């Protein structure tokens, strides 16, 4: 992609952490419980549908007892998460920030959670075109079937320009950071020919609404 490309770029700061909603936690595949860990009151998670209220179990050398499975984020609490890189591998850490302190919930491979989450939500574009996942995640999509020269922006049709506007809206309103590189080669047999590369902050992709918007944009020219 060395020539004839159009860039939509917002050079904001990649966020270290952000707040999420209960529906996001459910989309990741977790249930949130109030109970005890080794006899001390705590919040913790389990894989969705695998544990029941009143159940006591041992995991990782600790004893868990579930008093109540939550149906929403507790009052005056926040669900927070961040991406960290350790020994060259990314992890999603998330925890519950409450008036009584922080309760670590899990530290998981973000690639596995995104795969589970995107598959369940049928975000097929994200699943198909994702490249690498770290503090940022990149997507690459190549729909060029006949070799030709990329067109200048002035020759982009309205539908293609709309895609670029939608990308700007995502960067401005949802992620605050992003780089979208686009080449357009015109139409062949009523099919848009294009190539794109999109870099976004990984942490924002764990938001159901953000992933939904990105998935829709990636499908707009198909």
Swiss-Prot record:
Disulfide bonds: none annotated. NCBIfam families: TIGR00703 family protein. Belongs to the UPF0128 family. This is UPF0128 protein TK2294. It comes from Thermococcus kodakarensis (strain ATCC BAA-918 / JCM 12380 / KOD1).
């Amino acid at each position: 992609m060395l020539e004839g490309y159009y860039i939509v770029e917002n050079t904001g700061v990649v966020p270290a952490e952000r707040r999420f909603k209960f529906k996001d936690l459910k989309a990741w595949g977790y249930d949130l419980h109030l109970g005890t860990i080794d006899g001390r009151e705590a919040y913790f998670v389990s894989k969705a549908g695998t544990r029941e209220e009143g159940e006591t179990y041992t995991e990782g050398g600790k004893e868990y007892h579930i008093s109540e499975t939550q149906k929403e984020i507790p009052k005056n609490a926040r669900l927070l998460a961040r991406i960290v890189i350790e020994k060259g591998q990314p992890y999603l850490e998330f925890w519950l920030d409450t008036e009584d302190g922080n309760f670590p919930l899990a530290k998981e491979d973000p690639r596995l959670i995104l795969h589970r989450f995107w598959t369940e939500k049928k975000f097929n574009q994200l699943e198909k075109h994702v490249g690498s996942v770290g503090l940022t995640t990149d997507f690459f999509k190549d729909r060029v079937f006949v070799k030709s020269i990329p067109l200048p922006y002035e020759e982009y049709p309205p539908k293609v320009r709309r895609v670029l506007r939608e990308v700007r809206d995502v960067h401005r309103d949802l992620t605050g950071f992003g780089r979208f590189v686009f080449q357009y080669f015109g139409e062949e047999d009523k099919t848009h020919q294009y190539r794109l590369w999109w870099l976004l902050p990984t942490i924002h992709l764990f938001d159901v609404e953000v992933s939904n918007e990105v998935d829709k944009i990636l499908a707009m020219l198909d």
